Amino acid sequence: MATAMAASAAERAVLEEEFRWLLHAEVHAVLRQLQDILKEASLRFTLPGPSTEGPAKQENFILGSCGTDQVKGTLTLQGDALSQADVNLKMPRNNQLLHLAFREDKQWKLQQIQDARNHVSQAIYLLANRDESYQFKTGAEVLKLMDAVMLQLTRARSRLTTPATLTLPEIAASGLTRMFAPTLPSDLLVNVYINLNKLCLTVYQLHALQPTSTKNFRPAGGAVLHSPGAMFEWGSQRLEVSHVHKVECVIPWLNDALVYFTVSLQLCQQLKDKIAVFSSYWSSRPF
């Protein structure tokens, strides 16, 4: 019995020594690795900082779709804003070519990119507050930090992977409709959003429902992409979507950012799992 107790005490002493090493050395090694990865992610978002000089560079992207050639054009991205748009729309009814372009004095902020960037910045801030000189005293303290960092990274990723669901009146009321010169025709709506690593542009063509129409008017709810036949009320008019044209372009640095988020989340989870292994040995006391 005494031998077994001594062996148990020795095993516990070894585990406690390993756990102290985990808290004092390995945790900080993981935090350094996380900071390095997230700083790379922040560079993709062109985070403003004291070393940043001048505006973010402009990047031109050609819009395309495998299913239609009704819409062609380019979008110019400058950091988290669309600075230019040059779009040609072939109208289905008469094949007339309609040219849409942003006003020169306007930029359209992409809130998804801005929010994702802010969440990355917050994650970096949380990690920087626990520098090499900080001594973690318990596993619970590490878990709390990892949970906070993972929350910011999950939110950053979600902003890029989950576009907002908007109703057609919300799209019609958006400031994006006032970005164009000449003004958008009243029978067109335009929406722009990020989906994963793609910048998507959707053009909705509308027609008015006559008061004598026998169609059962049923306003559409919110959606990322509305379908032909979707109805809504705008002002004194009832309108229906007749055609939908969606084109997109791949933004390579968004793909990089998503990869960095995934790798960082995996590192956080691996550290949490290591803490959990030790906690299972002495779950009856704080760890």
Curated annotation (Swiss-Prot):
The keyword Nucleus applies. GO terms for biological process: amelogenesis; bone mineralization; brain development; circadian behavior; enamel mineralization; gene expression; hemopoiesis; locomotion. The modification N-acetylalanine is found at A2. The keyword Acetylation applies. Detected in brain, kidney and testis. Pfam families: Rogdi_lz. It is found in: Nucleus envelope; Presynapse; Cell projection, Axon; Perikaryon. GO terms for cellular component: axon; dendrite; hippocampal mossy fiber to CA3 synapse; nuclear envelope; perikaryon; synaptic vesicle. Keywords: Acetylation, Cell projection, Cytoplasmic vesicle, Nucleus, Synapse. Belongs to the rogdi family. Monomer. This is Protein rogdi homolog. The lineage of its organism: Eukaryota, Metazoa, Chordata, Craniata, Vertebrata.
